[in-house]
């Protein structure tokens, strides 16, 4: 069980109790980056053009930094430790806590993510994503829990997410040749700035999502959101089920509620 305890109706300084079973399958090998108990100032961890990399955060580990991964296959980030971005820029230059682009067979499991400067998990153009039993605590505007952009074959399960902004968002940006041609200004700039985020992707399809057995708490925005910032790309086979919404203070007059399809 994952529990929030609030004293005297104070929902901003509540106590989280997030127990876990011990992890008895600690990985070993040359492909493993191991963070043991204690504080680790990792800075920016960059992973590119690799296969089979494992980042393991053991119980008692607090890793300070953020992650950027691109063109990685079979990447795993797991353990019982904490990944914290409290030392990162939370001002004008703030970046997501973890960014993944063109990463196939990505797994994130067991860890606690806290104090993201921006989106917590930004996953772009990736296939075969499995997120299991992670915990998130984000307090800042734009602290989305998970933003999937043009991803396919995604399973999210057993998470506990308390974020100021949206918890799970499924987006579809567009950078097909036809779309770029119709959104290019005479000076060569793009009228749709989101093109830069997905330019060069192999595929823009958005399909096959299952989000199940999760606990959501959004302070300001939606807990579950499908379709914001869509650019002419179809959404197919997306399923949310058996999830719990602890808190929903979303106040959008056009798309209100714990979940919205926009």
What spans do the regions from the language model cover?
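Structural detector of coil-to-beta-strand junctions
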Residues: 66, 97, 120, 143-145, ...
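Beta-strand-enriched, solvent-exposed domains that form extended recognition/catalytic surfaces
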Residues: 1-28
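Glycine-centered low-complexity coil/loop motifs and glycine-rich tracts
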Residues: 228-234
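Short hydrophobic beta-strand that contains or immediately precedes a catalytic carboxylate
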Residues: 34-35, 56-57, 67
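N-terminal domain-start segments of secreted/luminal proteins
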Residues: 19-53
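Extracellular beta-strand-rich solenoid/capping regions of secreted or surface-exposed proteins
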Residues: 1, 40-54, 62-78, 85-107, ...
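Right-handed parallel beta-helix
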Residues: 52-54, 59, 73-84, 104-115, ...
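M14 metallocarboxypeptidase catalytic domain recognition
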Residues: 8-12, 38, 60
